[in-house]
Amino acid sequence: MYVRTYYHNNLPGVTSLPHDSLPPAAPERLETLGWNLWMLSGDDIEKQAAEIAERVGYTRPTDKINVLASETIESAGTVEEKVKMTAKLQASKEHYTATTSSVVLIVDGKGHYDIEDPIENMWIRVILTPGVLMHIPGGAHTRITFENPEGYLDVLMWFNVCIYVHKSINPSY
């Protein structure tokens, strides 16, 4: 099994349509942009995802977050609200800039996740299905779309845990 990715054809119209008329995006291209994708399978995808997330430095998972295509949040304060805000932004065909890097597991649902390729000036579309695990770099421009208004995604996210190191301050500077 693999994660399906391809270049969005950028034709006018509804961004939630497949827009699949250009070649696949090579995994090496995504890695160049700071992305890593995995396709997990089996009954233990959450455990597999946690092991991968920890291996790449992400140790703090969230609870499951439900993202609805019809989401209408006015302001985003919590992690869950920020994730849901991406669904709201997709309705206006705008992109969302990831402020911090994270690892995201699709637990249930289906959608499209568009990644900006600033070098090619195009969008790369990732087909989101259960088992897709993504490492999202901070600063990435993305957008999420659903095929229909009833679309949803259940996701788990991991973030870096900040480690503070106490240093003595030398007052003689």
Please state what every model-predicted region is:
Residues 127-148:
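Conserved metal-binding segment of the jelly-roll/cupin
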Residues 96-117:
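Short, conserved beta-strand element in jelly-roll/cupin
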Residues 105, 114, 127, 135, ...:
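Beta-strand cores of modular interaction/reader domains in eukaryotic scaffold and signaling proteins
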Residues 115-118, 123-124, 146-147, 167-169:
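A short secondary-structure junction signal
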Residues 64-99:
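Conserved short histidine dyad/triad with adjacent acidic residue
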Residues 1-70:
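N-terminal leader/capping segments at the start of a protein or of a new domain
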Residues 143-173:
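Double-stranded beta-helix
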